[in-house]
């Protein structure tokens, strides 16, 4: 999980005395490559996806990555460790990057923002439960 960063060990051992309220991160390298390349080159999603496949960053069937499923699974693992709870993957709201256009990227850039596929888990102040979502923002 998280590209070789020892995040699970840090959550289990290094942050054991702390209360974690939120996890936020970029959890899928394929999506990050696609979105970063779209921004840098102005090219459209399909073109950059094809490049990612040619470079071996994306699978022949990239749905697991670009539809956010891989990031959702990673988020569920991190949530389970960080919050000490079992996570049903079906409880994670998931949106992928398949519909992010070069125009979306350009508009975000004009306002000083970068579109990334983020995984976010946080405690719901009202219910006390955990809210999890993966979405481009």
Predicted regions and their residues:
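Rossmann-like NAD(P)H-binding beta-loop-alpha module
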Residues: 2-58, 69-70
